[in-house]
Amino acid sequence: MEKKYILALDQGTTSSRAMIIDEEGEVIGVAQEEFDQIFPKPGWVEHNANEIWASILAVIAGVLLKTNISSKEIAGIGITNQRETTVIWDKESGNPIYNAIVWQSRQTEDICKQLRKDGYEDTIRSKTGLLIDPYFAGTKARWILDHVDGAQERAEKGELLFGTIDTWLVWKLTGGRAHITDYSNASRTLLYNIYDLEWDDELLKMLNIPKAMLPEVRPSSEVYADTVPYHFFGEEVPVAGIAGDQQAALFGQGCFEKGMAKNTYGTGCFLLMNTGEKAVRSENGLLTTLAWGIDGKVEYALEGSIFVAGSAIQWLRDGLRMVRQSSDSENYASRIESSDGVYVVPAFVGLGAPYWDSDVRGAVFGLTRGTEKEQFIRATLESLAYQTRDVLYAMEQDSGISLKTLRVDGGASANNFLMQFQSDILGVPVERPENKETTVLGAAFLAGLAVGVWKDKNEIKKHWKLDKRFEVEMKEEQREDLYEGWHKAVKAAQAFK
Protein backbone atom coordinates (compact mmCIF):
# COMPACT_ATOMS: atom_id res chain seq x y z
CA MET A 1 0.00 0.00 0.00
CA GLU A 2 1.40 3.40 -1.01
CA LYS A 3 2.49 5.60 1.90
CA LYS A 4 1.28 8.98 0.73
CA TYR A 5 -0.19 10.74 3.77
CA ILE A 6 1.35 12.62 6.67
CA LEU A 7 -0.26 12.59 10.10
CA ALA A 8 0.22 15.95 11.84
CA LEU A 9 -0.34 16.21 15.59
CA ASP A 10 -1.12 19.67 16.97
CA GLN A 11 -0.90 19.60 20.76
CA GLY A 12 -2.36 22.95 21.89
CA THR A 13 -3.15 24.69 25.16
CA THR A 14 -6.78 23.60 25.39
CA SER A 15 -7.05 20.71 22.94
CA SER A 16 -5.16 18.14 20.89
CA ARG A 17 -5.79 17.71 17.18
CA ALA A 18 -4.74 15.20 14.57
CA MET A 19 -4.90 15.98 10.86
CA ILE A 20 -4.13 13.91 7.82
CA ILE A 21 -2.42 15.84 5.02
CA ASP A 22 -2.07 14.57 1.45
CA GLU A 23 0.74 15.11 -1.08
CA GLU A 24 -0.90 18.33 -2.29
CA GLY A 25 -0.78 19.83 1.19
CA GLU A 26 -4.55 19.50 1.59
CA VAL A 27 -6.16 18.57 4.91
CA ILE A 28 -8.09 15.31 4.39
CA GLY A 29 -9.47 14.86 7.90
CA VAL A 30 -9.38 16.29 11.42
CA ALA A 31 -10.09 14.94 14.91
CA GLN A 32 -10.00 17.10 18.03
CA GLU A 33 -10.26 16.45 21.75
CA GLU A 34 -10.24 18.96 24.60
CA PHE A 35 -8.70 18.29 28.01
CA ASP A 36 -8.92 19.87 31.46
CA GLN A 37 -7.20 23.06 32.55
CA ILE A 38 -5.99 22.91 36.16
CA PHE A 39 -5.76 26.13 38.18
CA PRO A 40 -4.28 25.26 41.61
CA LYS A 41 -3.86 28.94 42.59
CA PRO A 42 -4.51 32.33 40.93
CA GLY A 43 -2.07 32.79 38.06
CA TRP A 44 -1.08 29.10 38.02
CA VAL A 45 -2.00 26.91 35.03
CA GLU A 46 -1.26 23.19 34.84
CA HIS A 47 -2.18 20.18 32.69
CA ASN A 48 -2.25 16.48 33.43
CA ALA A 49 0.42 15.15 31.03
CA ASN A 50 -1.18 11.67 30.99
CA GLU A 51 -4.48 13.25 29.97
CA ILE A 52 -2.69 15.06 27.12
CA TRP A 53 -1.23 11.72 26.01
CA ALA A 54 -4.68 10.06 26.19
CA SER A 55 -6.13 12.89 24.06
CA ILE A 56 -3.38 12.33 21.46
CA LEU A 57 -4.17 8.59 21.24
CA ALA A 58 -7.87 9.43 20.90
CA VAL A 59 -7.37 11.90 18.02
CA ILE A 60 -4.98 9.57 16.16
CA ALA A 61 -7.58 6.79 16.26
CA GLY A 62 -10.37 9.27 15.53
CA VAL A 63 -8.86 10.77 12.39
CA LEU A 64 -7.84 7.39 10.91
CA LEU A 65 -11.34 5.99 11.48
CA LYS A 66 -13.06 9.14 10.22
CA THR A 67 -11.07 9.23 6.96
CA ASN A 68 -10.96 5.44 6.51
CA ILE A 69 -7.23 5.75 5.87
CA SER A 70 -5.11 2.81 7.00
CA SER A 71 -2.12 3.34 9.27
CA LYS A 72 -0.15 1.52 6.52
CA GLU A 73 -0.70 4.59 4.29
CA ILE A 74 0.92 7.03 6.74
CA ALA A 75 4.44 7.92 5.59
CA GLY A 76 5.38 9.86 8.71
CA ILE A 77 4.23 11.84 11.73
CA GLY A 78 4.88 15.55 12.36
CA ILE A 79 4.37 17.16 15.76
CA THR A 80 3.72 20.78 16.66
CA ASN A 81 3.15 21.80 20.24
CA GLN A 82 2.28 24.51 22.72
CA ARG A 83 5.77 25.76 23.51
CA GLU A 84 7.47 26.05 26.92
CA THR A 85 4.96 23.80 28.76
CA THR A 86 7.12 21.52 30.90
CA VAL A 87 6.88 17.86 31.98
CA ILE A 88 9.22 15.87 34.25
CA TRP A 89 8.68 12.12 34.39
CA ASP A 90 10.11 8.91 35.81
CA LYS A 91 12.38 7.22 33.27
CA GLU A 92 11.36 3.68 34.32
CA SER A 93 7.61 3.94 34.88
CA GLY A 94 6.94 6.76 32.39
CA ASN A 95 4.77 8.54 34.97
CA PRO A 96 5.03 12.32 35.41
CA ILE A 97 6.16 13.31 38.92
CA TYR A 98 3.99 16.47 38.80
CA ASN A 99 1.47 18.09 36.49
CA ALA A 100 2.79 19.77 33.34
CA ILE A 101 3.35 23.48 34.09
CA VAL A 102 1.80 25.45 31.21
CA TRP A 103 3.48 28.31 29.33
CA GLN A 104 0.93 30.84 30.70
CA SER A 105 1.56 29.89 34.33
CA ARG A 106 3.16 32.52 36.57
CA GLN A 107 4.06 30.18 39.44
CA THR A 108 7.81 30.58 38.90
CA GLU A 109 7.81 34.37 39.40
CA ASP A 110 9.89 34.08 42.60
CA ILE A 111 12.58 32.06 40.80
CA CYS A 112 12.68 34.71 38.06
CA LYS A 113 12.97 37.52 40.62
CA GLN A 114 15.95 35.74 42.20
CA LEU A 115 17.65 35.33 38.80
CA ARG A 116 17.21 39.06 38.12
CA LYS A 117 18.51 39.88 41.60
CA ASP A 118 21.54 37.66 41.00
CA GLY A 119 22.30 39.64 37.82
CA TYR A 120 21.71 36.90 35.23
CA GLU A 121 19.68 38.98 32.74
CA ASP A 122 22.54 39.80 30.35
CA THR A 123 23.93 36.25 30.47
CA ILE A 124 20.55 34.76 29.60
CA ARG A 125 19.87 37.34 26.88
CA SER A 126 23.28 36.88 25.27
CA LYS A 127 23.13 33.06 25.21
CA THR A 128 19.43 32.25 24.69
CA GLY A 129 17.94 35.37 23.03
CA LEU A 130 15.21 35.30 25.71
CA LEU A 131 14.15 37.41 28.69
CA ILE A 132 13.92 36.21 32.30
CA ASP A 133 10.22 35.40 32.53
CA PRO A 134 8.04 32.59 34.00
CA TYR A 135 6.93 31.95 30.39
CA PHE A 136 10.03 29.86 29.57
CA ALA A 137 10.62 26.22 30.49
CA GLY A 138 13.81 26.34 32.59
CA THR A 139 12.27 27.95 35.68
CA LYS A 140 9.31 25.54 35.46
CA ALA A 141 11.70 22.58 35.64
CA ARG A 142 13.44 24.16 38.64
CA TRP A 143 10.06 24.67 40.37
CA ILE A 144 9.07 20.99 39.96
CA LEU A 145 12.46 19.79 41.22
CA ASP A 146 12.06 22.11 44.24
CA HIS A 147 8.50 21.08 45.09
CA VAL A 148 8.51 17.29 44.64
CA ASP A 149 10.22 15.35 47.45
CA GLY A 150 13.50 13.78 46.40
CA ALA A 151 13.20 15.00 42.79
CA GLN A 152 16.55 16.81 42.64
CA GLU A 153 18.47 13.75 43.89
CA ARG A 154 16.62 11.44 41.50
CA ALA A 155 17.29 13.80 38.58
CA GLU A 156 21.00 13.84 39.43
CA LYS A 157 21.03 10.01 39.44
CA GLY A 158 19.50 10.00 35.94
CA GLU A 159 16.15 8.58 37.09
CA LEU A 160 14.03 11.51 35.83
CA LEU A 161 13.57 13.01 32.35
CA PHE A 162 12.70 16.59 31.38
CA GLY A 163 10.89 17.66 28.26
CA THR A 164 8.59 20.15 26.63
CA ILE A 165 5.39 18.63 25.21
CA ASP A 166 7.02 17.55 21.93
CA THR A 167 9.60 15.53 23.89
CA TRP A 168 6.91 13.91 26.07
CA LEU A 169 4.84 12.87 23.03
CA VAL A 170 7.80 11.46 21.08
CA TRP A 171 8.91 9.51 24.15
CA LYS A 172 5.39 8.06 24.58
CA LEU A 173 4.82 7.36 20.87
CA THR A 174 8.14 5.54 20.56
CA GLY A 175 7.75 3.59 23.80
CA GLY A 176 10.67 5.41 25.41
CA ARG A 177 13.09 4.79 22.53
CA ALA A 178 13.64 8.49 21.78
CA HIS A 179 14.21 11.23 24.37
CA ILE A 180 14.64 14.14 21.97
CA THR A 181 13.52 17.66 21.14
CA ASP A 182 14.13 19.90 18.13
CA TYR A 183 16.02 23.19 17.86
CA SER A 184 12.87 25.35 17.92
CA ASN A 185 11.64 23.92 21.23
CA ALA A 186 15.09 23.75 22.85
CA SER A 187 15.50 27.47 22.18
CA ARG A 188 12.53 28.21 24.50
CA THR A 189 13.96 26.62 27.64
CA LEU A 190 16.38 29.30 28.99
CA LEU A 191 18.92 26.43 29.08
CA TYR A 192 20.00 26.17 25.43
CA ASN A 193 22.72 28.26 23.82
CA ILE A 194 21.28 29.26 20.44
CA TYR A 195 24.70 30.25 19.07
CA ASP A 196 26.76 27.22 20.13
CA LEU A 197 23.74 24.92 19.64
CA GLU A 198 24.16 23.02 22.89
CA TRP A 199 22.80 22.82 26.42
CA ASP A 200 24.77 25.51 28.22
CA ASP A 201 26.68 24.45 31.35
CA GLU A 202 26.58 27.94 32.87
CA LEU A 203 22.80 28.17 32.42
CA LEU A 204 22.28 24.64 33.80
CA LYS A 205 24.38 25.54 36.84
CA MET A 206 22.42 28.78 37.28
CA LEU A 207 19.15 26.81 37.66
CA ASN A 208 20.82 23.67 39.05
CA ILE A 209 19.30 21.45 36.35
CA PRO A 210 21.14 18.10 35.95
CA LYS A 211 22.27 17.56 32.35
CA ALA A 212 21.36 13.85 32.58
CA MET A 213 17.63 14.67 32.47
CA LEU A 214 17.76 16.76 29.25
CA PRO A 215 16.68 15.48 25.83
CA GLU A 216 19.01 15.25 22.84
CA VAL A 217 18.47 18.23 20.49
CA ARG A 218 17.86 17.16 16.89
CA PRO A 219 16.94 18.83 13.57
CA SER A 220 13.29 19.80 13.03
CA SER A 221 13.02 17.50 10.01
CA GLU A 222 14.51 14.03 10.48
CA VAL A 223 13.37 10.49 11.24
CA TYR A 224 13.83 10.27 15.02
CA ALA A 225 12.36 6.82 15.73
CA ASP A 226 9.34 4.69 14.84
CA THR A 227 6.13 4.45 16.82
CA VAL A 228 5.57 1.31 18.87
CA PRO A 229 3.06 -0.84 16.96
CA TYR A 230 0.43 -1.09 19.71
CA HIS A 231 -0.06 2.71 19.65
CA PHE A 232 -0.56 2.72 15.93
CA PHE A 233 -2.83 -0.08 14.77
CA GLY A 234 0.09 -2.50 14.54
CA GLU A 235 2.29 -0.22 12.41
CA GLU A 236 5.71 1.24 13.05
CA VAL A 237 5.45 4.75 11.61
CA PRO A 238 8.41 7.17 11.58
CA VAL A 239 8.14 10.25 13.80
CA ALA A 240 9.88 12.66 11.43
CA GLY A 241 9.20 16.33 12.15
CA ILE A 242 8.91 18.64 15.17
CA ALA A 243 8.50 22.39 15.64
CA GLY A 244 7.02 24.62 18.32
CA ASP A 245 3.67 26.05 17.23
CA GLN A 246 4.81 29.52 16.12
CA GLN A 247 7.87 28.27 14.26
CA ALA A 248 5.69 25.61 12.61
CA ALA A 249 3.33 28.38 11.44
CA LEU A 250 6.28 30.31 9.96
CA PHE A 251 7.28 27.15 8.07
CA GLY A 252 3.69 26.39 7.05
CA GLN A 253 3.40 29.92 5.65
CA GLY A 254 6.38 29.26 3.40
CA CYS A 255 8.45 32.02 5.04
CA PHE A 256 11.70 30.38 3.97
CA GLU A 257 13.61 33.49 2.92
CA LYS A 258 15.30 36.03 5.14
CA GLY A 259 12.94 38.95 5.84
CA MET A 260 9.70 37.02 5.31
CA ALA A 261 7.28 37.35 8.23
CA LYS A 262 3.98 35.99 9.45
CA ASN A 263 1.45 37.15 12.03
CA THR A 264 -0.89 34.70 13.75
CA TYR A 265 -3.99 36.48 15.05
CA GLY A 266 -5.18 34.27 17.87
CA THR A 267 -6.11 35.20 21.43
CA GLY A 268 -2.93 37.27 21.20
CA CYS A 269 -0.71 37.83 18.17
CA PHE A 270 2.56 36.09 17.44
CA LEU A 271 4.80 37.73 14.87
CA LEU A 272 7.87 35.93 13.56
CA MET A 273 10.38 37.14 10.99
CA ASN A 274 12.89 34.81 9.38
CA THR A 275 16.36 36.36 9.80
CA GLY A 276 18.21 33.60 7.94
CA GLU A 277 21.31 31.82 9.18
CA LYS A 278 22.30 34.74 11.39
CA ALA A 279 20.79 35.37 14.81
CA VAL A 280 19.73 39.00 15.25
CA ARG A 281 20.07 40.36 18.78
CA SER A 282 17.13 42.62 19.57
CA GLU A 283 17.56 46.08 21.07
CA ASN A 284 13.78 46.51 21.16
CA GLY A 285 12.53 43.86 23.57
CA LEU A 286 11.94 41.17 20.94
CA LEU A 287 13.01 37.56 21.36
CA THR A 288 15.72 35.95 19.24
CA THR A 289 14.82 32.34 18.64
CA LEU A 290 15.70 29.32 16.51
CA ALA A 291 13.20 28.92 13.68
CA TRP A 292 14.16 25.39 12.65
CA GLY A 293 17.08 23.18 11.76
CA ILE A 294 17.02 21.38 8.39
CA ASP A 295 19.68 19.87 6.10
CA GLY A 296 22.51 20.38 8.56
CA LYS A 297 21.93 24.09 9.16
CA VAL A 298 19.75 26.20 11.42
CA GLU A 299 17.78 29.36 10.69
CA TYR A 300 16.83 32.03 13.20
CA ALA A 301 13.82 34.27 13.75
CA LEU A 302 12.86 37.40 15.63
CA GLU A 303 9.64 37.02 17.62
CA GLY A 304 7.29 39.54 19.14
CA SER A 305 4.09 38.77 20.98
CA ILE A 306 1.01 40.92 21.49
CA PHE A 307 -0.96 39.83 24.55
CA VAL A 308 -4.44 40.92 23.46
CA ALA A 309 -5.73 40.49 19.90
CA GLY A 310 -8.68 38.14 19.27
CA SER A 311 -9.52 38.40 22.98
CA ALA A 312 -10.30 42.11 22.42
CA ILE A 313 -12.97 41.06 19.90
CA GLN A 314 -14.28 38.48 22.42
CA TRP A 315 -14.46 41.34 24.94
CA LEU A 316 -16.69 43.32 22.54
CA ARG A 317 -18.92 40.24 22.30
CA ASP A 318 -18.98 38.85 25.85
CA GLY A 319 -17.96 41.78 28.06
CA LEU A 320 -19.65 44.73 26.36
CA ARG A 321 -22.23 42.80 24.30
CA MET A 322 -21.68 45.14 21.35
CA VAL A 323 -21.71 42.27 18.84
CA ARG A 324 -23.54 38.93 18.81
CA GLN A 325 -20.67 37.06 17.25
CA SER A 326 -17.07 38.02 16.64
CA SER A 327 -17.49 38.06 12.86
CA ASP A 328 -20.11 40.87 13.17
CA SER A 329 -17.29 43.26 14.09
CA GLU A 330 -16.25 43.43 10.42
CA ASN A 331 -19.71 44.60 9.36
CA TYR A 332 -19.93 47.32 12.05
CA ALA A 333 -16.40 48.60 11.37
CA SER A 334 -17.04 48.81 7.61
CA ARG A 335 -20.18 50.94 8.00
CA ILE A 336 -18.16 54.08 8.82
CA GLU A 337 -15.29 55.87 7.07
CA SER A 338 -13.10 56.23 10.17
CA SER A 339 -13.03 55.84 13.96
CA ASP A 340 -13.37 59.64 14.29
CA GLY A 341 -10.32 59.98 16.52
CA VAL A 342 -11.26 57.13 18.90
CA TYR A 343 -8.38 54.89 20.03
CA VAL A 344 -8.70 51.72 22.11
CA VAL A 345 -5.53 50.56 23.90
CA PRO A 346 -6.43 46.95 24.86
CA ALA A 347 -3.79 46.59 27.59
CA PHE A 348 -6.01 44.33 29.71
CA VAL A 349 -2.98 42.39 30.98
CA GLY A 350 -0.30 44.96 30.22
CA LEU A 351 1.47 45.50 26.90
CA GLY A 352 3.85 43.00 25.29
CA ALA A 353 6.55 43.74 22.71
CA PRO A 354 8.07 46.26 22.25
CA TYR A 355 6.77 48.05 25.39
CA TRP A 356 6.96 45.21 27.96
CA ASP A 357 4.88 47.19 30.44
CA SER A 358 3.00 44.80 32.73
CA ASP A 359 1.45 47.58 34.86
CA VAL A 360 -0.40 49.53 32.15
CA ARG A 361 -4.14 48.79 31.78
CA GLY A 362 -6.68 49.19 28.99
CA ALA A 363 -7.95 52.64 28.01
CA VAL A 364 -10.16 54.39 25.44
CA PHE A 365 -9.37 57.88 24.14
CA GLY A 366 -11.09 60.42 21.92
CA LEU A 367 -14.71 59.77 22.91
CA THR A 368 -17.27 62.47 22.07
CA ARG A 369 -21.05 62.71 22.41
CA GLY A 370 -21.19 61.56 18.78
CA THR A 371 -19.26 58.32 19.40
CA GLU A 372 -21.36 55.24 18.70
CA LYS A 373 -20.64 51.55 18.87
CA GLU A 374 -19.40 51.48 15.27
CA GLN A 375 -16.49 53.79 16.17
CA PHE A 376 -15.76 51.79 19.31
CA ILE A 377 -15.75 48.46 17.47
CA ARG A 378 -13.66 49.84 14.61
CA ALA A 379 -11.11 51.36 17.00
CA THR A 380 -10.81 48.01 18.81
CA LEU A 381 -10.06 46.19 15.55
CA GLU A 382 -7.61 48.91 14.53
CA SER A 383 -5.71 48.42 17.79
CA LEU A 384 -4.64 44.95 16.59
CA ALA A 385 -3.14 46.48 13.45
CA TYR A 386 -1.37 49.27 15.35
CA GLN A 387 0.19 46.79 17.78
CA THR A 388 1.34 44.68 14.83
CA ARG A 389 3.01 47.72 13.29
CA ASP A 390 4.76 48.44 16.62
CA VAL A 391 6.31 44.97 16.59
CA LEU A 392 7.18 44.91 12.89
CA TYR A 393 8.83 48.33 13.14
CA ALA A 394 10.96 46.97 16.01
CA MET A 395 11.86 43.94 13.85
CA GLU A 396 12.91 46.19 10.98
CA GLN A 397 15.03 48.32 13.34
CA ASP A 398 16.76 45.24 14.79
CA SER A 399 17.32 43.32 11.58
CA GLY A 400 17.88 46.12 9.08
CA ILE A 401 15.46 44.22 6.81
CA SER A 402 12.46 46.03 5.29
CA LEU A 403 9.32 43.92 5.24
CA LYS A 404 7.93 43.41 1.73
CA THR A 405 4.78 41.43 2.55
CA LEU A 406 3.10 40.12 5.70
CA ARG A 407 1.53 36.65 5.64
CA VAL A 408 -1.34 36.14 8.07
CA ASP A 409 -3.24 33.31 9.74
CA GLY A 410 -5.30 32.65 12.87
CA GLY A 411 -8.98 33.32 13.59
CA ALA A 412 -9.05 37.12 13.20
CA SER A 413 -7.27 36.94 9.82
CA ALA A 414 -10.71 36.07 8.38
CA ASN A 415 -11.79 39.67 9.16
CA ASN A 416 -11.46 41.51 5.83
CA PHE A 417 -11.76 44.98 7.38
CA LEU A 418 -8.92 44.24 9.79
CA MET A 419 -6.67 42.77 7.07
CA GLN A 420 -7.21 45.79 4.79
CA PHE A 421 -6.49 48.20 7.65
CA GLN A 422 -3.43 46.11 8.55
CA SER A 423 -2.07 46.54 5.03
CA ASP A 424 -2.85 50.27 5.07
CA ILE A 425 -1.21 50.96 8.44
CA LEU A 426 1.91 48.91 7.55
CA GLY A 427 2.22 50.24 4.02
CA VAL A 428 2.85 46.71 2.67
CA PRO A 429 0.56 44.06 1.16
CA VAL A 430 -0.99 41.43 3.44
CA GLU A 431 -1.42 37.87 2.13
CA ARG A 432 -3.92 35.41 3.54
CA PRO A 433 -3.59 31.75 2.50
CA GLU A 434 -6.47 29.48 1.49
CA ASN A 435 -5.49 26.98 4.17
CA LYS A 436 -5.34 28.80 7.50
CA GLU A 437 -4.10 25.68 9.35
CA THR A 438 -0.53 26.86 8.86
CA THR A 439 0.76 25.48 12.17
CA VAL A 440 -0.35 21.94 11.32
CA LEU A 441 0.89 22.30 7.75
CA GLY A 442 4.31 23.35 9.05
CA ALA A 443 4.60 20.17 11.13
CA ALA A 444 3.37 18.07 8.19
CA PHE A 445 5.82 19.66 5.75
CA LEU A 446 8.76 19.11 8.13
CA ALA A 447 7.86 15.42 8.50
CA GLY A 448 7.14 15.01 4.79
CA LEU A 449 10.56 16.41 3.86
CA ALA A 450 12.25 13.84 6.09
CA VAL A 451 10.40 10.85 4.61
CA GLY A 452 10.45 11.99 0.97
CA VAL A 453 6.80 12.99 0.45
CA TRP A 454 8.17 16.39 -0.64
CA LYS A 455 11.61 16.85 -2.19
CA ASP A 456 12.59 20.28 -0.87
CA LYS A 457 11.33 23.68 0.26
CA ASN A 458 10.72 24.76 -3.34
CA GLU A 459 8.22 21.95 -3.79
CA ILE A 460 6.53 22.89 -0.50
CA LYS A 461 6.24 26.53 -1.65
CA LYS A 462 4.00 25.40 -4.49
CA HIS A 463 1.46 24.11 -1.96
CA TRP A 464 1.06 27.56 -0.38
CA LYS A 465 -2.10 28.91 -2.05
CA LEU A 466 -3.30 32.51 -1.84
CA ASP A 467 -6.86 33.22 -0.70
CA LYS A 468 -6.67 37.02 -0.82
CA ARG A 469 -4.01 39.71 -1.14
CA PHE A 470 -4.83 43.04 0.52
CA GLU A 471 -3.05 45.91 -1.27
CA VAL A 472 -2.24 49.25 0.36
CA GLU A 473 -4.99 51.82 -0.31
CA MET A 474 -4.22 54.51 2.28
CA LYS A 475 -2.05 57.56 1.56
CA GLU A 476 1.16 57.81 3.57
CA GLU A 477 0.24 61.11 5.25
CA GLN A 478 -3.02 59.64 6.60
CA ARG A 479 -1.20 56.47 7.70
CA GLU A 480 1.39 58.39 9.71
CA ASP A 481 -1.23 60.71 11.27
CA LEU A 482 -3.26 57.73 12.49
CA TYR A 483 -0.17 55.97 13.81
CA GLU A 484 1.00 59.08 15.65
CA GLY A 485 -2.41 59.19 17.37
CA TRP A 486 -1.92 55.58 18.46
CA HIS A 487 1.42 56.45 20.05
CA LYS A 488 -0.16 59.32 21.95
CA ALA A 489 -2.88 56.96 23.21
CA VAL A 490 -0.33 54.36 24.40
CA LYS A 491 1.73 57.03 26.19
CA ALA A 492 -1.40 58.40 27.87
CA ALA A 493 -2.43 54.89 28.99
CA GLN A 494 1.06 54.30 30.40
CA ALA A 495 0.87 57.56 32.35
CA PHE A 496 -2.35 56.42 34.07
CA LYS A 497 -1.24 53.82 36.61
UniProtKB/Swiss-Prot annotation:
Q: Which UniProt keywords apply?
A: ATP-binding, Glycerol metabolism, Kinase, Nucleotide-binding, Phosphoprotein, Transferase
Residues where sn-glycerol 3-phosphate binds: 13, 83-84, 135, 245
A single GO BP term for this record reads:
glycerol-3-phosphate metabolic process
Q: List residues binding ATP.
A: 13-15, 267, 310, 314, 411
Gene Ontology MF: a single term: glycerol kinase activity
Q: Phosphohistidine is carried by which residues?
A: 231
Q: Provide the residue positions that the database annotates as binding ADP.
A: 13, 17, 267, 310, 411, 415
Q: How is its activity regulated?
A: Activated by phosphorylation and inhibited by fructose 1,6-bisphosphate (FBP).
Substrates-to-products reaction catalysed: glycerol + ATP = sn-glycerol 3-phosphate + ADP + H(+)
- Kindly give the Gene3D superfamilies that the UniProt entry links to this protein: 3.30.420.40
Does the entry feature the keyword Phosphoprotein, yes or no?
Answer: yes
* Primary enzyme class: transferase
The record ties this protein, via InterPro entries, to:
ATPase_NBD, Carb_kinase_FGGY, Carb_kinase_FGGY_CS, FGGY_C, FGGY_N, Glycerol_kin
Could you tell me which pathway this protein works in?
Polyol metabolism; glycerol degradation via glycerol kinase pathway; sn-glycerol 3-phosphate from glycerol: step 1/1
**Described function:** Key enzyme in the regulation of glycerol uptake and metabolism. Catalyzes the phosphorylation of glycerol to yield sn-glycerol 3-phosphate.
On subunit structure and binding partners, the annotation says:
Homotetramer and homodimer (in equilibrium).
Q: What's the protein name?
A: Glycerol kinase
Q: What is the lineage of its organism?
A: Bacteria, Bacillati, Bacillota, Bacilli, Bacillales
